UniProtKB/Swiss-Prot annotation:
Name of the encoding gene: Mptx1
The record's free-text note on cofactor binding: Binds 2 calcium ions per subunit.
GO cellular component entries: extracellular region
The protein's required cofactors: Ca(2+)
Tissue specificity annotation: Expressed in colon.
Protein name, per record: Mucosal pentraxin
CDD domains to which the protein is assigned, alphabetical: PTX
Subcellular location: Secreted
Leader sequence segment: 1-19
Binding site for Ca(2+) 1: 77-78, 155-157
InterPro entries xrefs: ConA-like_dom_sf, Pentraxin-related, Pentraxin_domain
Pfam families: Pentaxin
Length: 219
């Protein structure tokens, strides 16, 4: 019986089974530049995506490039990637192709980012702090792979690893949500925490390295 229980626990770990945590009112803090600090977000369902919506909030005072959200599969880097190259310059990747959205550089911190993409038209729509930054064409007809490693805090240069400290995120991230469909972004509430793939109020995650959970400072 003891061997059976151990076997079941081992299979649960292999399958990525993690207890759900209600993160409402909390944030992940990445206190310093690092190549080892990150959080893996485990979706409720692993599936290929022909549409998706991603929303999250973040605070940082970095002036160098950094990753906000990194979604890789074993066969493709940058399946979904949110990356800031310069202040106010948001690089949004789907299937390792990129669209660049530019915002005013004097925006107040923190920022609320919402972006959606649909395969049939290839249209990516980007909103920042409740205001649209426009729509651009990106990888029309593509399907995002479903067997993914989803990481905040680092940019994956290989599946689940090969991190560069000079691209790491330093600051705070909270209210991350991912949906498997296009959500009209003008209707996404300020809380933006109820995605059907990643839900901040029922979050499956694994933290690694120097990551701290604290009550959030901002709404």
């Amino acid at each position: 019986m003891e061997k059976l229980i151990v076997g079941i626990l081992f299979l649960s770990v292999l399958s990525g089974s993690v207890a759900q945590t209600d993160m409402k009112g909390k944030a992940f803090i990445f206190p310093q530049e690092s190549s080892t600090a990150y959080v893996s977000l485990i979706p409720k369902v692993r599936k290929s995506l022909q549409n998706f919506t991603l929303c999250m909030k973040a605070f940082t005072d970095l002036t160098r490039p950094y990753s906000i959200f990194s979604y890789n599969t074993r066969t493709k880097d940058n399946e979904i990637l949110l990356f800031v190259e310069n202040i106010g310059e948001y690089m949004f990747y789907v299937g390792n192709l990129v669209a660049i959205f530019k915002a005013p550089t004097n925006l107040p911190d923190p920022v609320r980012i919402c972006v959606n993409w649909e395969s049939v038209s290839g249209i990516a729509e980007f909103w920042l702090n409740g205001k649209p930054l426009g729509r651009k064409g990106l990888n029309k007809g593509y399907t995002v792979g479903g067997d993914a490693m989803i990481i905040i805090g680092q940019e994956q240069d290989s599946f689940g690893g090969n991190f560069d400290a000079k691209q790491s995120f330093v600051g705070e991230i909270w209210d991350v949500s991912l949906w498997d469909h296009v959500v009209p972004l003008e209707k996404v509430s300020d809380s933006c925490n109820n995605g059907n793939l990643i839900n901040w109020q029922a979050l499956n995650y694994e933290d690694n390295g120097y990551v701290v959970i604290k009550p959030k400072l901002w709404p």
